[in-house]
Amino acid sequence: MIEDKRWGGVYSFEDSPYIMEILTELRDKDTDSIKFRKGLVKLGRYMGYEITKTMDVEKVKVETPLEETEGIIVKDRRNVVIITVLRAAIPFMEGLIKVFEHARVGIVSAARGKPPKFEIEMNYIKIPQITPEDTVIVADPMIATGSTLLRVLEEVKKYGTPKRTLVVGVLAAPEGITRIKEKFPEVEIFVAKIDRELNDKGYILPGLGDAGDRAFGEPVKITTLPQVHYIE
């Protein structure tokens, strides 16, 4: 885990060969949706393991079949709220929840608009109550302009003040990190890698493309919804 000195509380896992190998497969344009989803699950899981190293632990006594010895429990692991930003974060969250199996889960549906404004539309929000003992993990694979996460973090504030708030992703652009840290300096950011920059469409370079489309397929744009008839 490497802290980036350009900001406080921003970490990458570029020193982990295995995490970098998974990221390499995700970047590959020939990686199919099945492998892409599995890669996001693996990244969520291994990044979750790394994040536990930053959490408070407690020493405990444990009885083995032979004698008593000393062990530890990761206290904060039992008080986690994972906020999932649909849709690319679904497999990523699946990996995180393998580490934080006690986590309560919130769901946010957010869509980023077109450049240059990149306005965010949020049409579904379900977040559990947040307590001062909680660590909130906002899971979003791609931290590009930061617009989506700024809106999500504003919503999270309405549900309580946690012990810590973490934004966890796969890739980030410096532009998005800067915007988040300017508005929410207390938020910690963990990503597999910080990439070079954004292009004029707001995509991360070199990036890995649209994570949602690559994981689940490109959606078909329907201008009118089909009429549904209900039978009583």
From Swiss-Prot:
Pfam families the record matches: UPRTase
Cofactor: Mg(2+)
Ligand binding (5-phospho-alpha-D-ribose 1-diphosphate): 87, 112, 140-148, 210
SUPFAM superfamilies (alphabetical): PRTase-like
Residues engaged in binding uracil: 204, 209-211
Keyword ATP-binding set for record: no
Annotated cofactor note: Binds 1 Mg(2+) ion per subunit. The magnesium is bound as Mg-PRPP.
Catalytic reaction list: UMP + diphosphate = 5-phospho-alpha-D-ribose 1-diphosphate + uracil
Annotated control of activity: Allosterically activated by GTP.
Entries under InterPro entries matching the protein: PRibTrfase_dom, PRTase-like, Upp_A, UPRTase/APRTase, Ura_phspho_trans
GO biological process: UMP salvage; uracil salvage
Membrane-spanning segments: none
Keywords recorded for this protein, A-Z: Allosteric enzyme, Glycosyltransferase, GTP-binding, Magnesium, Nucleotide-binding, Transferase
Keyword NADP: no
E.C. number: 2.4.2.9
GO molecular function list: GTP binding; magnesium ion binding; uracil phosphoribosyltransferase activity
Classification via HAMAP family: Upp_A (MF_01218_A)
Similarity comment: Belongs to the UPRTase family.
Function statement: Catalyzes the conversion of uracil and 5-phospho-alpha-D-ribose 1-diphosphate (PRPP) to UMP and diphosphate.
Record NCBIfam families: PRK00129.1, upp
Record-given protein name: Uracil phosphoribosyltransferase
Species whose genome carries this gene: Pyrococcus furiosus (strain ATCC 43587 / DSM 3638 / JCM 8422 / Vc1)
